[in-house]
Amino acid sequence: MDPNTVSSFQVDCFLWHVRKQVADQELGDAPFLDRLRRDQKSLRGRGSTLGLNIETATRVGKQIVERILKEESDEALKMTMASAPASRYLTDMTIEEMSRDWFMLMPKQKVSGPLCIRMDQAIMDKNIILKANFSVIFDRLETLILLRAFTEEGAIVGEISPLPSLPGHTNEDVKNAIGVLIGGLEWNDNTVRVSKTLQRFAW
């Protein structure tokens, strides 16, 4: 196994632990909490794939981070922060829309790269809009948090979400998955449109 893969996982586990402490002290906003929940699923999947214990990895990750911070000068930290591009978090959906449970009468599920597509094939002759929450960097979609398809009545009839066991996806992965979802919904004579935010950055 590549040692860099292991050390990356260990550091990610410790940084997630730090962010969890921030959330427990009620210092995180909605995008922060969204990423925290998503990354927890991702870490569990990676831990299972790598055969590594998360608690042990967190302790080792702490040692790695502490060693780096001890060697890092304040000036170097300032330069790193100044040169790093900042990503923006964009939200079409409210927290309620993101966290709401939904059920399918005729479920269909398909995996497209690192993304999972789910839709209800029982939905027919509806006007549907696709909404998503995601981060953007350099005016391109960076990370999809969650995409859902809503009817005019507000019912959820489809979804695209990252697979926890396959972290990381590209803008092209998201475009392909959206195409699959739209094609599946339009097959039943539904009219599908994409939110303005998605149109600008991901479609």
UniProtKB/Swiss-Prot annotation:
Protein name in UniProt: Non-structural protein 1
Written domain comment of the UniProt record: The dsRNA-binding region is required for suppression of RNA silencing.
GN (gene name): NS
Pfam families per UniProt: Flu_NS1
Post-translational modification: Upon interferon induction, ISGylated via host HERC5; this results in the impairment of NS1 interaction with RNA targets due to its inability to form homodimers and to interact with host EIF2AK2/PKR.
A GO biological process held by the record: symbiont-mediated suppression of host cytoplasmic pattern recognition receptor signaling pathway via inhibition of RIG-I activity
Keyword line: Eukaryotic host gene expression shutoff by virus, Host cytoplasm, Host gene expression shutoff by virus, Host mRNA suppression by virus, Host nucleus, Host-virus interaction, Inhibition of host innate immune response by virus, Inhibition of host interferon signaling pathway by virus, Inhibition of host PKR by virus, Inhibition of host pre-mRNA processing by virus, Inhibition of host RIG-I by virus, Inhibition of host RLR pathway by virus, Interferon antiviral system evasion, RNA-binding, Ubl conjugation, Viral immunoevasion
Example GO molecular function: RNA binding
Main localisation: host cell
Extent of motif Nuclear export signal: 137-146
One GO cellular component term noted in the UniProt record for this chain: host cell cytoplasm
Organism: Influenza A virus (strain A/Singapore/1/1957 H2N2)
Chain spans, region RNA-binding and homodimerization: 1-73
Localization annotation: Host nucleus; Host cytoplasm
Role: Inhibits post-transcriptional processing of cellular pre-mRNA, by binding and inhibiting two cellular proteins that are required for the 3'-end processing of cellular pre-mRNAs: the 30 kDa cleavage and polyadenylation specificity factor/CPSF4 and the poly(A)-binding protein 2/PABPN1. In turn, unprocessed 3' end pre-mRNAs accumulate in the host nucleus and are no longer exported to the cytoplasm. Cellular protein synthesis is thereby shut off very early after virus infection.
SUPFAM superfamilies per record: Ns1 effector domain-like, S15/NS1 RNA-binding domain
Intrachain S-S bonds: none
Oligomeric form and interacting partners: Homodimer. Interacts with host TRIM25 (via coiled coil); this interaction specifically inhibits TRIM25 multimerization and TRIM25-mediated RIGI CARD ubiquitination. Interacts with human EIF2AK2/PKR, CPSF4, IVNS1ABP and PABPN1.
Family: Belongs to the influenza A viruses NS1 family.
Short motif (Nuclear localization signal): ranges: 34-38
InterPro entries linked: NS1, NS1A, NS1A_effect_dom-like_sf, uS15_NS1_RNA-bd_sf
Signal peptide: none
